[in-house]
Regions:
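N-terminal "assembly arms/tails" that initiate or stabilize quaternary assembly
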Residues: 12-53
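Oligomerization/assembly interface segments of phage tail-like spikes and tubes
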Residues: 26-42, 78-90, 227, 288-302, ...
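Short beta-strand and beta-hairpin "edge-sheet" elements
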Residues: 54-85, 171, 315-347
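Acidic, small/polar-enriched beta strand-loop surface segments
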Residues: 160, 190-290, 294, 301-340
Length: 353
């Protein structure tokens, strides 16, 4: 499996096809990462440098080299370990500058964030000249709404959180014109819960799951939150989000004192402010749902092929030998290549509704 090395001018300077192991991870709504393990060769250091890029044919994501480590070991031999993250990590380099309220269409809101922080910011030094926004026409994206207030939040954390809340993905791909093209996208439903697309099923019955791990937990589940906003003591403004009673009620406190009714555009009405508190509460509850995950090494050369029959973010049908079955989306995919061969490990997550 070959890797292409690009310098900071996006010029191809080397092809890597000799290494002891490589782990390359793509993710649906967060940045991916990689690790490559080499037998030490000083020539590698000529083109494996921090801030250079790695491109893999089997992935649409491009990685940034961030860490280079040399291990000297008289018994095991000397090794070079190169690690880094995908282009999505660029968003960590910016914050929401000052106080901002985003209300209305979600995609438009994210585009505004990117315009103000990266594409056409008022502070020229914040601009990344080759960064562009590619709007989606998918109704799964265009119908989504936002009603949030931010002050100094990390841009990456904001976009990641919004995508996770709405079960959508985001990506930054390197185009043929050497642009960093940002876009939102939604996976295709290929489960038994729809009839428009061919089914993709991973199950022992189809002999396409080599091994699997199933995990389910309600330990951190919460369904009611008291959201406390601005003010002090008994005068602090609060909202209750969620409902349940008795033993089924699981409460959570949400500190929302960072949400202010006084904004750069004027004072929020009571209704507008309470809507902001409720949004904050819903986000906190979304971080405390029942956790269900299914990890497995799958056979991807015969029945269903990654990159042809299914992609990151797609909703597929999964089952294991113990009767755990349902639909879930592919949240990440690990490509592992070593002397033992090529393996692909997807992680499936249930959809929060």
């Amino acid at each position: 499996m070959e890797l292409l090395v690009l310098n900071t001018d996006f010029e191809s300077i080397a092809v890597i096809d000799t290494y002891e192991s490589m782990i390359w991870t793509d993710r649906y709504n967060s940045y991916g990462d990689f690790e490559i393990f080499f037998a030490m060769d000083t020539q590698l250091l000529q083109y494996l440098k921090e801030d250079y890029y790695l491109w893999l044919k089997d992935s649409e994501h491009c990685m940034i080299i961030e860490d280079i480590k040399i291990n000297a070991d008289t018994e095991e031999g000397n090794h070079l370990i190169v690690t880094g993250r995908s282009l999505e990590s660029i968003l960590e380099r910016r914050i929401i500058w000052g106080q901002r309220i985003f209300n209305g269409n979600l995609q438009n809101g994210i585009q505004t964030m990117l315009n103000e922080c990266i594409i056409s910011p008022s502070i020229a030094d914040r601009k990344i000249s080759n960064f562009v926004f590619v709007p989606s026409t998918d109704p799964k994206i265009t119908r989504l709404k936002i009603d949030n207030q931010y002050t100094g939040d990390c841009l990456y954390d904001v976009i990641k959180g919004l995508c996770e809340e709405n079960n959508i993905g985001f990506k930054i791909v390197l185009t043929d014109e050497n642009e960093f093209a940002f876009s939102l996208y939604a996976g295709v439903d290929r489960s038994y819960e729809q009839t428009e697309n061919p089914y993709v099923v991973f199950s022992p019955n189809f002999e396409n799951i080599i091994n699997s791990n199933y995990y389910s937990s309600r330990a951190s589940f919460r369904n009611v939150t008291l959201v406390a906003g601005e003010g002090e003591g008994a005068a602090r403004r609060t909202a209750i989000v969620g409902s349940a009673s008795g033993l089924d009620r699981r409460e959570l406190f949400t500190d929302a004192r960072d949400i202010s009714s006084d904004t750069e555009d004027g004072t929020l009405s009571d209704a507008e402010y309470m809507a902001q508190l409720r949004t904050k509460g819903l986000k906190n509850l979304a971080d405390h749902i029942v956790t269900t995950a299914f990890e497995g090494e799958v056979e991807v050369t015969r029945l269903f092929k990654y990159g042809e029959d299914f992609f990151i973010g797609d909703i597929v049908q999964i089952a294991n030998e113990y009767g755990n079955e349902g639909s879930a989306y592919i949240s990440e995919l690990v490509i592992s290549n070593s002397e033992e061969g090529l393996s692909i490990y997807p992680t499936f997550k249930t959809i929060s509704k």
